[in-house]
Amino acid sequence: MSGLSASEAAQRLTRDGPNAQPQPDQRHWPRILASVLREPMLLLLIAASVLYLSVGEPRDAAALGLSVLLVVGLTLYQEVRAEHALQALRDLSSPWASAWRDGALQRVPATSLVVGDVVQVAEGDRVPADAKLLDSSDLHVDESLLTGESVPVARAPGADDAAARIHAGTLVVRGQAMAEVTATGSGTEMGRIGASLGALNREATPLQHEIRRLVLWFTAASIASCVLVFGLYLTLRGGWLDALLAGITLAMATIPEEFPVVLTVFLALGAWRMARLRVLVRRPPAIEALGSVTVLCTDKTGTLTENRMALTQLLTGGGMPHTPDQELDGDSLSLLRCAALASDANGFDPMDRAVHAVASASLPESTAADWEHLKHYPVTPALPAYATAWRRKHQPGLLLACKGAPEAVAALCGLADEDRSRVLADAASMAAEGLRVLAVADAHTTNADAPDSLENEAFTWRGLLGFADPLRAEVPAAVAEAHAAGVRVVLMTGDHIETARAIAIAAGISDHPEVTLGAALEQLDADALRALLARTDVFARVRPEHKLRLVQALRDAGEVVAMTGDGVNDAPALMAAHVGVAMGGRGTDVAREAASIVLLDDDFASVVRAIRMGRTIFANLQRATRYIVAVHVPIAGLALLPLLLGTPLILLPLHVVFLEMVIDPACSIVFEREPAEPDLMRRPPRPASTPLLDLRMIAASLLLGASAFALVLLVYMIASRAALAPPQTAALAFTALVVCNIALVQWHLAPSRSGIAGPTNVAFWITLVAVLALLACLTLLSAPAQWFGFIPVSLPAFFAAVAAPALSLAGAHWIIRRLRKVRVAGPVPTVPQDAGG
């Protein structure tokens, strides 16, 4: 099979477009702009601008008009940036397909398929495009996505037209096939009925619900205070214009429009940063759950190991071990030939490839050259072995070649107890060396047709194959980091008990692991299983239903579970876990769809990196929301001050816009880029019930904001006593307010560090320099000052207004840290290093 050439495929892709459905939820910038123009902050600015125009203040109206453009530009930048991150994730989450190109079977993005491509699909795959079958073996397809019928239907070439076709989006539940693509993208049956594939899930998350509650609470308080201030100002002071401006300013100062923006930006950019670590987030709740994971269940092959199988040992029925680099005797060659016939020469399975690599070098002729393939028998829970049926050309009878778990193949061969014990002891000895062990057997039959099942055939034991799959170099360090973070690592593998034990020791999961076989779990009730899980970290010969039961038992015990999987039957366990982790390289489409996270490199260390990133995102999101609560207190206080003191308005809508120019970048850029604290992965997992903001945090933020307002008030009172003009007093109070804003950013960035932000957060320093430069222009230069309703102040007064709040808050931060160190006896508690072992 040659398939299309790469150049022809590229030409057809240019002509027909990508194999993708439209994405109705994708937001381009005009749609984003329309949503920005409906923001409450913008509507208040427009209202204030119209108000200024109506009373003959065109300069103030123009200034607010310019500020409207600034707010629109900044908000549009944030939203477009988040949307670009989401689009990058959509591109990464696009499925892959196996297609013949330039005479070789290749893994290509499904979006690059074109009409005429020859694709190969197997159990667990989503069909990537509409196609006509060329060849198939026991193919059954779930077409419920198109027809609503849940019963899989058989498909085969040569049948009527409908039965010889497969359609995009349907699921292969059994067998395999080769097919020629006949339609792609919107031209498929799926496209014609208007379905959309590949879009990221945007369901509401617990954090989103919490943010909505905060927004509703603060909005209600904002509206109530705005109406109250307008009424009181009008009653006590008179002048509807000032009363209305005071109400609008207070509303702008207190409406919590930053909350939803911060959540959107953090989750989108957090998922994008994870993708750069080769971790694809398919569902937003996974980011929230990652920081709470207490148990990480992992398989072995390709996750803890490199999935780079090499056939290193052949052990025949005579008990003589051989290595492939030796000259093989007749029994070893027969073993190798049988293993090659039981392996897919064009597949992606690393053990199949390893067998064929040795067979092509060791066997005198092409193994399958004289054989016609008739049927294959996939692995099932009842028989963990793979077999194929072959007919030798020009000769009667059939050959059945089988390879699989030694126990299953031994039972298939009907070995006597003594022989069975011997071969299983050989398998255990090989497994104890860390080898992946498969048994090989064959059967000859005179029947003309391949049998429906293998159980009634007379199989002959041929021997054992030992595959070396080296442990990934970074796994021991990643396991140690997980243990230090209070995350227990549990190994669930289908491998031999001794292989599981050897890998667990090498990876550092446990020094002396107690290994339990999957079959033993079937004899345990819920209480016994819970007791077993409390002391066991390694499970061998585990089937998918065992994984599901283990995950459910861990959840029932109160653990937050992350689970890795790659097969069709792993989907229930992946969905049952709080965080399902599918393999992007070797995983099936079904597993990827069931999972909330996909590892693009199938690497265990990536899971631990994702846990670290999840903790970092939540910690930074918590910092940002606490800062939002704190920073609005001094702004609201300065907006209320004239009403309490009977002085002219200090804060105007334009001033609040300037403050928003500080608050929004601080939330969406500075906090989002704050690196993890050094001890983040030495702390226990965050309880899943931990809210983003609890009452204690809100009270602390309000108190911190009140302290900042007290400093602003102090500067204002000193300036008033210095007999400065009211616009100069307002300028100094505004300066102190902006500096307090920056100080609050720094305060919340790293509470465990000193009073000055760490040098790693470049975004903070850029924001600081830019804001202070603009602030100096607004308060020291005549023209900009007039636009803001100020009169320029002296340089010493400006420096005093900058230094007083900055030094006061930095000093308070330093004192609090000293008091904490005195109050805490000894170091901050960390998770014991042997946790999980």
Task: Give the label of every model feature segment.
Residues 63-94, 101, 203-298, 465, ...:
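Hydrophobic alpha-helical transmembrane segments
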Residues 18-99, 104-106, 151, 217, ...:
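Transmembrane helix-loop-helix hairpins at the membrane interface
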Residues 2-3, 15-24, 73, 81-84, ...:
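Actuator/coupling domain of P-type ATPases
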Residues 63, 94-212, 334-336, 523-533, ...:
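Cytosolic catalytic regions of P-type ion-transporting ATPases
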Residues 167-171, 289-418, 422-460, 467, ...:
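Cytosolic catalytic regions of ATP/NTP-dependent phosphoryl-transfer enzymes
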Residues 68, 74, 104, 182-185, ...:
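Conserved beta-strand/loop elements of the cytosolic catalytic core of P-type E1-E2 ATPases, chiefly
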Residues 229, 267, 333, 347, ...:
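Membrane-embedded transport module
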